[in-house]
Amino acid sequence: MGHSPSRHNACGGGGGDGESPPSPLPSRFERFRRRLRLRHRDRAGRPGGDAHASESGTGRAIAVDEFAGIARIRIVKEKKVVVETNGPHIARISVFETNRFSKNTLVGYCEVDLFELLTKDLDEHSEVLSLLDPSSSATIVGSISISCYIEDPVETEQSFARRVLAIVDYNEDGELSLSEFSDLMKAFGNKLAVAKIEELFRQADKNGDGIVDMDELAALLANQQEKEPLISNCPVCGEILGKHDKINDMIHMTLCFDEGTGNQIMTGGFLTDKQASYGWMFKLSEWAHFSSYDVGLHSGSTASHILVFDRRTKRLVEEVIDGKIVLSMRALYQSKVGLTLIDTGVKDLLKNLSEKQGKKMSSPESAKDIPKFLELFKDQINLDEVKDPLESFKTFNEFFVRQLKPGARPIACYEQDTIATCAADSRLMTFSSVDESTRLWIKGRKFSIEGLLGKDVHSDALCNGSLVIFRLAPQDYHRFHVPVSGTLEKFVEIPGCLYTVNPIAVNSKYCNVFTENKRVVSIISTSEFGKVAFVAIGATMVGSIEFLKEEGDYVHKGDEFGYFAFGGSTVICVFEKDAIEFDADLLANSARSLETLVSVGMRLGVSTRNRDLQPQELEKCSLE
């Protein structure tokens, strides 16, 4: 049902005795369109008309006779994704809202397992997925329809040939002349191919018309690569090809062609929500050379954002820092001038500021800041996990040290004490030795295990051991848990400063964050790992470090151990030399100076001393 558009009489206007029949009344739809045209004309001729119309339009409810219907918009967007057998297969689709006040605000998202989706027959119908509220995964804000299929290798080759052809298609006619073909062969870096360019051109030109089109080039590349590879080097980055098969070479070059253009047809690495919304592409796959994009170490000290790898979703996540804060932290922590300021009183200033802020966040007035905080991190705090209702928190600090519902953080291999687990919701770095940590991450000139643990907790086994760093951000769950089962031997409180634990400071050679900050060192004596040092380190704005266990207590891995009051903070666990084998994915990310986003209870590593589990059993209890 609906209103049919009115039909006007098409007769010419001539004299006549009879009156012309009256025109039918315009439909509601036509009246609505007419008003839109008039408004558009008025706005076009009136300065500031848009603002006026917007203001008046939102100031009143719509009248019944003005309602024409609800526009249903269908957006079709195709994205090609490289799927590896043992690689990432969870795709995240994010919906952003953009207006004059807020740019690219995440309003909904969904996640889909591509492996699961590809096993379904979606040729005749699409899969409808629910869009979830970023602040509460239990709330549905909309739906999205997607379809997915495996691209035929021939289609992949043709698509690749089209991209390659565009490099030297100077007149943009979709075809290659002999001179353009010659330039393409030279770009491929194959000396043998250059010597017989004309022969290859004739071989490609199947119909003998003196030009090579896209289909002919695709056929040449496909056939010749099997016999005598034409492409020795990537024409974009110069990397040597042929290490794998031709499909991997094609994927590598396609990613190179796409990078930075904002016109990506294929994704082989990982995008953050922010990067995807801006159309950025960063190469972080096995087909790309990692040196082309610096993560962690360099970007952490020079950029206004930090990239971390989400272990659960296998995605990069962008941790954005306010630009003004970045500038101030660089000035303070990454310059000799800043070092001078630190030595002349900034240490005391930061400490006093943190103490005052801690008191403020424990006052009843601070409760009003909770909604603002949730709005700021609405896509990173899941309120469904919080144990107590939001209205029960009487101060900001009560909310900040909130407890989670039972089962919100399952513990990997709970009955197996040979498996260590993550101690905090955090960004994690693992290192097999102190030398590795200082080479890849910690740039303070005076960092050492002895300095970290203090003179009262000295052990040669620990000093030569391995370490893991858990960095907590303000939006994280701020209670820390026991990573291994054992007996608590001692607690040693070490006074100190309250520098930030942000990578901008950690990566600085001018200050020694971990060995100068206020911290509490506890020793856990275990049968599986020997002695493990658990170091809770305060940071800027951290009012206090509270422990819930005492000396002599036996603790089981996953037990709640303590919490940090308001601010960012860090936990460092030091294991004896060769006592633990960290999980391979954590070590691989750390080797690239890339932090891994983990949750309490995720697997950290396995004891090298008492291996009660077989490798296949270890896989079963892996919690990621």
From Swiss-Prot:
EC assignment: the record states 4.1.1.65
Question: Which positions does the record annotate as the modified residue Pyruvic acid (Ser)?
Answer: S569
Residues holding Ca(2+) 2: D205, N207, D209, E216
User: Mind telling me which GO cellular component terms the entry cites?
Assistant: endoplasmic reticulum membrane; vacuolar membrane
Q: Tell me if Ribonucleoprotein is a UniProt keyword of this record.
A: no
| Cofactor(s) listed in the protein's UniProt record | pyruvate
Top-level taxon in the UniProt lineage? Eukaryota
Region annotation (Disordered) ranges? 1-30
Reaction equation(s) it catalyzes: a 1,2-diacyl-sn-glycero-3-phospho-L-serine + H(+) = a 1,2-diacyl-sn-glycero-3-phosphoethanolamine + CO2
The enzyme's first-digit EC class, named in words, is lyase
Give GO terms: molecular function aspect only: calcium ion binding; phosphatidylserine decarboxylase activity
Its localization reads: Vacuole membrane; Endoplasmic reticulum membrane
Give the metabolic or biological pathway: Phospholipid metabolism; phosphatidylethanolamine biosynthesis; phosphatidylethanolamine from CDP-diacylglycerol: step 2/2
According to the record, cofactor stoichiometry and binding are noted as: Binds 1 pyruvoyl group covalently per subunit.
Site, Cleavage (non-hydrolytic): residue positions: G568, S569
The record describes its membrane topology as:
Peripheral membrane protein
- PROSITE patterns for the chain: C2 (PS50004), EF_HAND_1 (PS00018), EF_HAND_2 (PS50222)
The record places domain C2 at 16-129
- PTM section of the record: Is synthesized initially as an inactive proenzyme. Formation of the active enzyme involves a self-maturation process in which the active site pyruvoyl group is generated from an internal serine residue via an autocatalytic post-translational modification. Two non-identical subunits are generated from the proenzyme in this reaction, and the pyruvate is formed at the N-terminus of the alpha chain, which is derived from the carboxyl end of the proenzyme.
User: Which amino acids does the record list as binding Ca(2+) 1?
Assistant: D169, N171, D173, E175, E180
Domain (EF-hand): residue spans on this chain? 156-191, 192-227
Functionally, this protein is described as follows: Catalyzes the formation of phosphatidylethanolamine (PtdEtn) from phosphatidylserine (PtdSer). Plays a central role in phospholipid metabolism and in the interorganelle trafficking of phosphatidylserine.
HAMAP family per the record? PS_decarb_PSD_B_type2
Q: How does it assemble?
A: Heterodimer of a large membrane-associated beta subunit and a small pyruvoyl-containing alpha subunit.
Q: What's the family?
A: Belongs to the phosphatidylserine decarboxylase family. PSD-B subfamily. Eukaryotic type II sub-subfamily.
> How is this protein named in the record?
Phosphatidylserine decarboxylase proenzyme 2
Q: Which organism is it from?
A: Oryza sativa subsp. japonica
